[in-house]
Amino acid sequence: MALEYLEQEPWRFLISSATVIFLVLNIAAVLTLAERKVSAYIQLRYGPNRVGPRGLLQPAADVVKLFIKENVSPGRADRWVFLAAPIAMFLPAAAVWLVIPFGPGMVVADLNIGLVYFFAITSIGALGVIMAGYGSRSNFSLLGALRGAGQMISYEVPLILSLLGVAMLTGSLSMVDIVEYQAGGFWNWIIWPQLPMFLAFFVSGLAEVKRIPFDLPEGESEIVGGFMIEYSGMTWALIQASEFASMAVMSAVASTLFLGGWQPPLPFLDLGVFNWLWLGIKTTLLIFVFQWIRWTLPRLRMDQLMDLGWKILVPVTILWLFVTAGAMLVI
């Protein structure tokens, strides 16, 4: 009887969703170590090297430390909104993984509107930032939340436009169909005809994740941590996990839509059921670029951030949509 229940679609979806959340939390923990190691490499340091061999157990030590820290809520805070905000930030980052295909038949939910689902879920992240700023009842938190909301909503526009070209080329909104469209070798990857769109998507992804040079909602040197200033312990850890999970999911989506997803760069490198390794390699490389930018570029001013989004990325993506449409008509 238990096996019959597990074969039913709701149970399968719930188990798959729980597995995805567990994996996302572990990915976020590993990325904290990767972030420290990359920053140490860039700054000619060793990085964490005390806990476990070569510091590999540092994430476990961090989790234990954060578990035993007290979760302090400000006296004036709207408690339920304050505590719900980290969850509202983390769940969208985890939910996107449900539609990312890791290999042939390896997807939790193969939606025929996968791109629309991605747009809808990522836009919810701004709500969590607003909840954190409003629920904290702190001027710095509120200012950071307003910055974050303006930034994330502004960069949703070029983010969506950058993926319309992909949908036009493939004729589908399903991520599985888009990956299968890129089969046959790296010369069939969508990044080549859609290079400006890929760059626009990547820059918009940086802004959506709120990473340097787009970390104005946090801005430690300006607004003392922004919307995160009143959080501590595991609530603070969940916000950090949502940031790292968002970075990983943006890299995975970029790899899926522009770099062939699970498709190998050359046909003879096909690994069959282990093709998910190719998606992992591509995603890891893009995560490294995220971290490289984080530790080498300064923060932009608010006016520079808005100018980049509205005056450069939006016109470029609209122009390339017309170029793509014209090329499809001619060819």
Curated annotation (Swiss-Prot):
An example Gene Ontology CC term for this record: plasma membrane
Localization, UniProt: Cell membrane
Bilayer topology annotation: Multi-pass membrane protein
TM annotation in the entry: 13-33, 80-100, 113-133, 159-179, 183-203, 249-269, 273-293, 311-331
Disulphide linkage map: none
Top-rank taxon, per record: Bacteria
Catalytic activity: a quinone + NADH + 5 H(+)(in) = a quinol + NAD(+) + 4 H(+)(out)
Pfam families noted in UniProt: NADHdh
Keywords tagged on the record: Cell membrane, Membrane, NAD, Quinone, Translocase, Transmembrane, Transmembrane helix, Ubiquinone
Enzyme class: translocase
Biological function: NDH-1 shuttles electrons from NADH, via FMN and iron-sulfur (Fe-S) centers, to quinones in the respiratory chain. The immediate electron acceptor for the enzyme in this species is believed to be ubiquinone. Couples the redox reaction to proton translocation (for every two electrons transferred, four hydrogen ions are translocated across the cytoplasmic membrane), and thus conserves the redox energy in a proton gradient. This subunit may bind ubiquinone.
Family statement drawn from the similarity comment of this UniProt entry: Belongs to the complex I subunit 1 family.
Protein name: NADH-quinone oxidoreductase subunit H
UniProt lineage: Bacteria, Bacillati, Actinomycetota, Rubrobacteria, Rubrobacterales
